A protein has these predicted regions:
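Surface-exposed, interaction-prone regions used to assemble/regulate multi-protein complexes
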Residues: 1-145
Length: 145
């Protein structure tokens, strides 16, 4: 039996920003760039998470496509570095290339996101905190039901 697909589109280039569902704590299986989009594919049985159960209880999986406003140079990725030194109070972030980032999906969790006009910040966790910033004009949530 084929799975049903329900697609929702959210525009970030409008005067009023949309309210996006946040797949908090959900595991990302893969991250790639295709057709000028950053694509996150989430694990199966995603409806077991509270953040999804209250929004789409019938969802089996989720694919999010972030359509880049210009090109893949619009994506900036930073990984938190451990603090070094005597007091270890400072934290720093190291810029990552996308190929380095795409290798971190073994235990990558989606934490939250922040929206602005044609701009998006996504906070992830893959053994360390990762901050992804991108210029995005629209986002598609493809729910696999």
């Amino acid at each position: 039996m084929l799975d049903k697909v329900n697609t929702e589109r959210f525009c970030l280039n409008q005067p009023q920003l949309p309210e996006l569902p946040i797949p908090h704590d959900c595991m990302i299986k893969s991250a790639l760039i295709e057709n000028n989009c950053l694509v996150f594919t989430f694990e199966d049985d995603i409806s077991g998470y509270d953040s999804i159960r209250c929004y789409k209880p019938e969802a089996k999986s989720l694919i999010i496509r972030y359509h880049l406003a210009h090109d893949k140079a619009d994506i900036r990725i930073f990984k938190r570095q451990a603090a070094h030194g005597l007091f270890r109070r400072r934290e720093s972030y190291k810029a990552l290339e996308f190929r380095e980032f795409s290798k971190l999906t073994e235990r990558m969790e989606y934490l939250t996101h922040y929206l602005a006009y044609c701009s998006l910040i996504i906070e992830l966790c893959a053994y360390d905190n990762i901050s992804l910033r991108a210029d995005v004009d629209h986002i598609e949530y493809e729910w696999i039901l």
